[in-house]
Amino acid sequence: MTNITKRSLVAAGVLAALMAGNVALAADVPAGVTLAEKQTLVRNNGSEVQSLDPHKIEGVPESNISRDLFEGLLVSDLDGHPAPGVAESWDNKDAKVWTFHLRKDAKWSDGTPVTAQDFVYSWQRSVDPNTASPYASYLQYGHIAGIDEILEGKKPITDLGVKAIDDHTLEVTLSEPVPYFYKLLVHPSTSPVPKAAIEKFGEKWTQPGNIVTNGAYTLKDWVVNERIVLERSPTYWNNAKTVINQVTYLPIASEVTDVNRYRSGEID
């Protein structure tokens, strides 16, 4: 079996997992439905997260929170299908050159616009050996131009086939046609990350007060081994359809404890 065939099979498995793990951040409330006055949610997340950096996470607990804090070009809809995220539309030429058109109202939580250059920086950072991302090889599934040589140390990260045509247009060039490429972009590691915050705070950029997000929520509080609290982001482009105002994640590994706290009303 060739390496390409093996990689295609792995990519198919990755896609299935990604589509199954969708997270709904917004909702259309039916006419006549009155929402509860207090819109909060408390969830058991299974364990303490190792990081909130999209390029450092690899477990389900981390991914659950990352999808609330950061939004990539695409997201998964309620049925697990890829849907527009920061990219409101996209097109391709022979499934090899992909162009993503970003929303002009997409913003970071500090009010600055989310741009195509943010994605260029993020994707280059994800494959940078200095980042040591567990998903550094993820973009190989999409056969992005230059990725193999970059991971082998033969080319610089600036040779990755991703380019900002302008603030709201991102062009991605692949080494071969990949019809399913857009589906890969719901993965947390392809989300944009805030360059200014990372350069200012270094490894502490994900701490409350330092972190800048572009998803439906921002980080309000993080008490290790106790709770992570997220609150609704007023700068999120689809904030008008965000229903839950606050989400609290609890790191409860014991199923017995989880059930008992659910029965007592401590977990939703």
Language-model features and meaning:
Residues T2-L25:
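Gram-negative bacterial Sec-dependent N-terminal signal peptides
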Residues A26-T34:
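Cleaved targeting-peptide boundary
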Residues E37-Q50, E88, V97-F100, F119-S122, ...:
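Short, well-ordered beta-strand elements
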Residues N44-D94, Q124, N210-T213:
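N-terminal lobe/hinge region of extracytoplasmic solute-binding protein
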Residues L74-L78, A95, R103-K107, Q124-A132, ...:
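Sec-exported extracytoplasmic/periplasmic mature domains
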Residues H81, D148, G153, D159, ...:
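Gly/Pro-rich hinge or "lid" segments in bacterial periplasmic/extracellular proteins
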Residues E88-Y135, E171, R261:
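Aromatic- and charge-enriched surface segment that lines or borders ligand/interaction sites
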Residues N92-D94, A164-D166, V224:
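Residue-level recognition of beta-strand termini and adjacent short loop/turns
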